[in-house]
Design a protein with these regions (language model features):
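Carbohydrate-active catalytic/glycan-binding domains of CAZyme proteins
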Residues: 31-412
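Bacterial Sec-dependent N-terminal signal peptides
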Residues: 1-32
Length: 412
């Protein structure tokens, strides 16, 4: 009698499971995950081998104790002139109440930054500061800088000192955002400049702004904010923030740009000039950083680095060799707000002398009142070289034919 050889029945779900498992195994063995690929391509590194691995610590400064009716904020970069540290900052007219743009007048403010002028302070050690007085005053009626000048930064070039700052012409330019009493901004909002042969002045303000908002359909069509400098290849890179792309109720300004850029509440662009006073030409690649609001830039090696307190890449450091194309190098930091770093060597051209990085600076804090804080960190070139050398030792070991790890190469 002939035996029946029955073929075992294979359920469809089991077959699908086997096929899925085989395909998954094949993919895992022949491909790399996105995270692992970024690591192997060198775009991310472990903390021990990342020259940007750091922490920011914050200390309250002496010399800026609480004064009723007085506010100071947005300090500039810090420079060293003859062994004395200098910084500049916004200081609104004392004892003026912030009442919002609908109620403000010549003695009350529309916003916290209204009725401001540029003041400065000096220090011998970076901890204890002494306010020296007003550096740049508001312009005469009818000028672009009549109502308020604020949020300064400093540049040293060609034997002169250049202060750049935001400027508002008139209270009539104050726009109410209606979200709350003091919401809104001056629209337009431009960048002005003053020049001096000494950090102590006297300062001569230029007759025209050095940068203005773009056309109505541009990403920076309303305001230009928070200027700061970097020098490369004989060119002056002026970074600036623009915002107010959110749909306001009512709209601060009309135009299609309110819709085109509604998902981009703030970003950073750059304008470049061969002369400190301009003319500045905005990069065709703008915006170059997606985020901003109290950002800080500094020269490092042959490029530039930046912190972003807000935006999709907030709490990070990003760097660009060309000053245009930034890539994140570390994330998850508590970065200074409105920070101005001490610029060792002041404003060197990084194509001539490598940027030395930063180790300290000054930022502002808003609570319990507007005041300055010192931040300390270690993003120095010296530390960066040391970390790179240590990483090179590991790479040499990985590529050597010897499996014995030389004790002399042990990292500290």
């Amino acid at each position: 009698m002939r035996k029946n050889h029955l073929t075992p029945k294979i359920s469809k779900p089991f077959l699908l499971f086997v096929l899925f498992s085989l395909s998954t195994f094949q993919y895992a063995s022949s491909q790399e995950s996105a995270s692992y690929k970024r690591f192997r391509e060198g775009n991310v590194q472990y903390e021990r081998y990342n020259e940007f691995n750091t922490e920011f610590t914050f200390t309250k400064l002496d010399g800026f104790e609480f004064e009723k009716g007085v506010e100071r904020y947005y300090p500039s970069s810090v420079i060293d002139v003859g062994g004395t540290y200098y910084m500049w900052y916004s200081k609104p007219q004392p004892n003026t109440e912030v009442v919002g743009p609908n109620s403000a007048n010549d003695s009350t403010r529309a916003f916290h930054w209204d009725l401001s002028e540029i003041w400065y302070a000096t220090s011998s050690d970076g901890f204890k500061w002494e306010e020296q007085g007003r550096a740049v005053k508001r312009g005469a009626a009818g000028r672009y800088d009549h109502r308020s000048i604020f949020n300064p930064d400093i540049l040293i070039a060609e034997g002169k000192y250049y202060l750049v700052y935001q400027a508002a012409a008139s209270l009539s330019d104050a726009r109410w955002g209606k979200a709350f009493k003091i919401a809104g901004d001056f629209v337009p909002n431009v960048l002005g400049m003053a020049v001096a042969e000494s950090p102590n002045g006297p300062w001569l303000a230029l007759d025209k702004p050095i940068l203005t908002p773009g056309p109505e359909d541009a990403w920076d069509g309303e305001v230009v904010h928070e200027p700061t400098f970097f020098v490369k290849g004989g060119q002056y890179f002026l970074y600036y923030k623009s915002d107010a792309r959110l749909p306001w109720k009512p709209n601060i300004s009309k135009g299609d740009f309110n819709k085109a850029h509604a998902d981009m509440p703030l970003a950073t662009g750059v304008a470049i000039a061969s002369n400190p006073e301009g003319p500045y030409v905005k990069s065709k690649y703008n915006p170059v950083l997606m985020g901003g609001h109290g950002s800080m830039v500094w020269p490092y090696r042959n490029g530039v680095c930046a912190t972003l307190p807000e935006g999709p890449e907030r709490n990070s450091i990003l760097c660009a060799k060309d000053g245009i194309n930034f890539y994140p190098v570390i994330q998850g930091l508590t970065v200074p707000k409105g920070g101005g770093a001490f610029r060792p060597g002041n404003f060197v051209d990084v194509d001539v002398t490598q940027g030395k990085g930063i180790t300290w600076g000054v930022g502002h804090a808003l609570s319990p009142y507007y005041h300055f804080v010192r931040f300390d960190t270690d993003l120095s070139l010296e530390k960066g070289d040391r970390v790179r050398n240590e990483y090179e030792l590991i790479q040499n070991y990985m590529n050597s034919g010897d499996y014995e790890y030389d004790a002399s190469l042990q990292l500290k």
